[in-house]
């Protein structure tokens, strides 16, 4: 919470069924339009909420129009002198950077081509990202997929789909190679092209 990023609320709870104790459960906040309403007081028809799930990108609320426009702008104008200023009109840059840093720090390899939710207020709002489902973090499943879940993975390469990461797409031990094949670059293109801009690089580094 102190980082100023949106995240899925979580609370361990004791679970009872018909008065009989069943065990400890993880009670989690939904990351749909209810999340935005309960945290920001905005109704479903006031927001765009985008979901990236495995091979699919969809609008949970509103449309994809503003998101697609933002991605197109980043891909085509990252070298412009006013890029950072224009980007700041489309997204909450500091929140996006903090989201990136957190996901990379925990080595969440089930992301960014999966488990990604992005939202904005339609009227004058900027896109924000929601942290959720980081169970692949910290090399938790390293034994299941050594290359893909290695806690020493270069997450900058992984997140941008460059370097050695592109070679893992053909590895039988890579459970998530879909993030790096040629037809799936749309999943990493936003961060990749943002990082081609010096002003964004500087902000990310500081």
Predicted feature locations:
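Catalytic-core segments of enzymes that bind and process phosphorylated/nucleotide-bearing substrates
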Residues: 1-206
């Amino acid at each position: 919470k102190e980082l100023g990023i949106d995240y899925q609320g979580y609370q361990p709870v004791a679970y009872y069924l018909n008065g009989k104790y069943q065990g400890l459960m993880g009670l989690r906040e939904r990351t749909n339009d209810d999340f935005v309403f309960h945290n920001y007081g905005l109704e479903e028809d006031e927001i765009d909420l985008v979901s990236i799930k495995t091979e699919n990108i969809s609008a949970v609320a509103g449309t994809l129009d503003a998101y697609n426009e933002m991605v197109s702008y980043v891909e085509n104008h990252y070298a412009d002198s006013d890029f950072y200023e224009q980007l700041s009109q489309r997204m909450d840059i500091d929140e996006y950077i903090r989201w990136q840093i957190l996901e990379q720090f925990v080595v969440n390899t089930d992301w960014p081509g999966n488990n990604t939710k992005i939202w904005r207020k339609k009227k004058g709002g900027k896109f924000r990202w929601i942290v959720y489902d980081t169970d692949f973090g910290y090399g938790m499943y390293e034994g299941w997929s050594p290359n893909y879940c290695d806690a020493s993975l270069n997450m900058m390469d992984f997140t941008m789909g460059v370097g050695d990461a592109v070679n893992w797409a053909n590895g039988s031990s890579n459970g998530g190679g879909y993030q790096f094949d040629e037809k799936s670059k749309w999943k990493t293109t936003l961060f990749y092209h943002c990082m081609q801009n010096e002003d964004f690089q500087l902000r990310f580094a500081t």
